[in-house]
Amino acid sequence: MAELTAKKDHRSEIGLVQAVAAHAFGVAVGELNGRNGTAGRARQVAMYLARVVLKLGLRETGRAFGRDHKTIFHACRRVEEAREDPTFDRTVEWLETLVRRAASAPA
């Protein structure tokens, strides 16, 4: 029973990460799981937030996004490289803060 609750909690946290990233990049949440490239940066940032803020493993994050663990690794690396741009870095930092606060808020 506890295992089911833990999985449910991760799903709601993943939903939070996806909603925050989608809103920040002006795309629909549904586009994040699609194969279309227009939501690519938002999808990469959502994957990055799942790994960094939620501390999910590569495989677990991959399952949540319907992607292979290698894709998650690549997405996180791309976001880390893009953080060289100060504007993008501030955006990601802000998103990390939002997700941390929302994830730790009482239900």
Describe every region a protein language model picked out.
Residues 19-43:
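Short, Lys/Arg-enriched anionic-surface-contact patches
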Residues 64, 74-75:
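Residues in the recognition helix of alpha-helical DNA-binding motifs
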Residues 2-3, 78, 82-107:
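Intrinsically disordered, low-complexity basic tails/linkers immediately adjacent to helix-turn-helix/homeobox/MYB/SANT
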Residues 59-68:
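Short alpha-helical "recognition helix" segments of helix-turn-helix
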Residues 69, 73:
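RNase H-like, Mg2+-dependent phosphodiesterase core
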Residues 40-56:
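Short, amphipathic alpha-helical "recognition" segments used to contact nucleic acids or chromatin
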Residues 8, 32-35, 63:
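C-terminal helical "lid" subdomain and adjoining coupling/linker elements of P-loop NTPases
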Residues 1-18, 107:
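General nucleic-acid-binding
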